[in-house]
Swiss-Prot record:
Native organism taxonomy: Eukaryota, Metazoa, Chordata, Craniata, Vertebrata
Keyword Coiled coil among UniProt keywords: yes
Compartment list: Cytoplasm, Myofibril, Sarcomere, M line
BP GO terms, sorted: intracellular signal transduction
Name assigned to this protein: Leucine-rich repeat-containing protein 39
Organism, scientific name: Bos taurus
Entry keywords, A to Z: Coiled coil, Cytoplasm, Leucine-rich repeat, Muscle protein, Repeat
LRR repeats: 84-105, 107-128, 130-151, 153-176, 177-198, 200-221, 223-244, 246-267, 269-290
């Protein structure tokens, strides 16, 4: 009996030794595998970094990363070694997201990631206090973070053809240097209050949205000289539009306007307007030009058309003043 006990104890001891050895061997193999994977990652990052370095150019004194029509769904962290970059131009590379570490590129002046498949803007974008141009057109972005308002140097913002953006955070009115804003081909139903309160805005494109009317507070955009509103559903214009003294270009083609209001006569700085493809009530024929060249260059639904329409409207006793937006319209506060 005692011999059996001794024999069993010896077997258990040997078993325990072997189990420890096997466990240690497995741990060693795991560490070895992890080490090899780490080496592979380091090697891949070095290869990526080498490829990225080859894409860096210098133009007009700026250090630019320029990639187009290559497959870069994500950007490696090794890119951080190129933190001297001042401009990114990454087009048609299938990029799925802006890297979270974007905020560490403190020297960035231009970030152009148009024509990719980006779905969101990281909050870290707000750390780019030197950024002057942000181009994110032709992506799949649905919302804009309020942190973008921290980009105090931003002068140009393009979010065209994302198709699903319907509003902007109010905080974007703090972009005191923003002069150029492109929101065309999205889902806006009104001009956001943030836009109406951007003090330096000079150029705005909200074409191909779902605008039905313009807010009375549109007059706040006193520095605006160019306004694109083509391909919307606008039915009337507010009287306050005539107070936009610096407006020189106004495009209203492909809307639902039935009349051109008399108040637009006051807009003496207008140099170009377009009322083409609106269901206007009056049919207006422009007087013939003195020569063929003038006839060819004349805009059929432009400035002369507008003034002629207003005159015809007066003769017909069909004067239409600029409308005030209806009580249920969305006004811009603050």
């Amino acid at each position: 009996m005692s011999e059996n006990v001794v024999s069993t104890g010896a077997v258990n001891a040997v078993k325990e030794v072997w189990e420890k050895r096997i466990k240690k061997l497995n741990e060693d193999l795991k560490r070895e595998k992890e080490f090899q994977q780490k080496l592979v990652r380091i090697w891949e990052e070095r290869v990526c970094l080498t490829k990225l370095r080859e894409k860096v150019t210098k133009e007009d004194g700026r250090v630019i990363l320029k990639i187009e029509k290559e497959e870069w769904k994500t950007l490696p962290s090794s890119l951080l070694k190129l933190n001297q970059l001042q401009e990114w131009q990454l087009h048609r590379i299938g990029l799925l997201k802006i890297p979270e570490f974007i905020g560490r590129f403190q020297n960035l002046i231009v970030l152009d990631l148009s024509r990719n498949t980006i779905t969101e803007i990281p909050r870290g974008i707000g750390l780019l206090t030197r950024l002057q141009e942000l181009i994110l057109s032709y992506n799949r972005i649905k919302t804009v973070p309020m942190e973008l308002s921290y980009c105090a140097s931003l002068e140009k913002l393009e979010l065209a053809v994302n198709r699903d953006i319907s509003d902007l955070p109010q905080e974007l009115s703090n972009l005191l240097k923003l002069t150029h804003l492109d929101l065309s081909m999205n889902l806006f139903t009104t001009i956001p209050p943030a836009v109406l309160n951007m003090p330096a805005l000079e150029w705005l494109d909200m074409g191909s949205n779902r605008l039905e009317q313009l807010p009375d507070t549109i007059e706040r955009m006193q520095n605006l000289h160019t306004l694109w509103l083509q391909r919307n559903e606008i039915t009337c214009l507010p009287e306050t539009i005539s107070s936009m003294k610096n407006l020189s270009t106004l495009v209203l083609s492909n809307n639902k306007l039935q009349d051109i209001p008399v108040c637009m006569e006051k807009m003496t700085n207008l140099r170009f307007v377009n009322f083409r493809d609106n269901p206007l009530k009056l049919e207006v024929t422009l007087p013939p030009s003195e020569n063929i060249e003038e006839e060819e260059e004349r805009e059929l639904f432009g400035l002369q058309f507008m003034h002629t329409y207003i005159q015809e409207s007066r003769r017909a006793g069909n004067q239409v003043n600029c409308s005030t937006t209806s009580p249920n319209s969305i006004d811009a506060d603050g």
